[in-house]
Amino acid sequence: MEPLAVYGRSQIETNTNLSRSLSISILDEKGNEIPFETNSDSIEFLIPRDPNLRIPRMILTNETFHSLNLTTDLPISVHFEIKANFPYRFVYKFDKQSTFTNSIEVNQSYFRFMIDNQQTIGHRTLIFGFEGENQEYEYRVYSSGCYYLNKENEWKSDGLRVGRKTNLSQTHCYLT
């Protein structure tokens, strides 16, 4: 496994052999690189995940609430896949908020939802769960991120957002 460059001034080193990267350069007709800044048009790209990545099975449970530690300094998106044969209200909150301020009514047996990387910045804990009957359901949670390596060899995410086309086989990134 190769270590990735450290994000910002973080002391955390991430080792991975499951990440993919994409390098983009815009060249003029003479082959010289043209620096660019985003404007009102966003640039989108899809980065495939490593096909050798073992996708975890969904977890069968009847627990009402779950806690997820957001332990990285890198901004991440959090993705949920839920299979339930009953209507419920999906709720979530960050850190020590006293009430669940975010909720979604769900009346379908398979539900996908994401919290994008702009919403998780600065948070350390995500609590999510279900309001409704205490019945068995299956769920899976995973994360994604979109980053670039700056001139100081540090990973940054300024101007990059994880998109809704992200799934278990690809990460959707766009510059805003």
Language model regions located:
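Secretory-pathway extracellular proteins and peptide precursors enriched for disulfide-bonded cysteines
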Residues: 136-138, 162-166
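Regulatory and partner-binding modules of innate immune sensors/adaptors
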Residues: 152-164
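Long, contiguous ectodomains of secretory-pathway proteins
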Residues: 1-155
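Extended, hydrophilic extramembrane loops/domains of integral membrane proteins
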Residues: 166-176
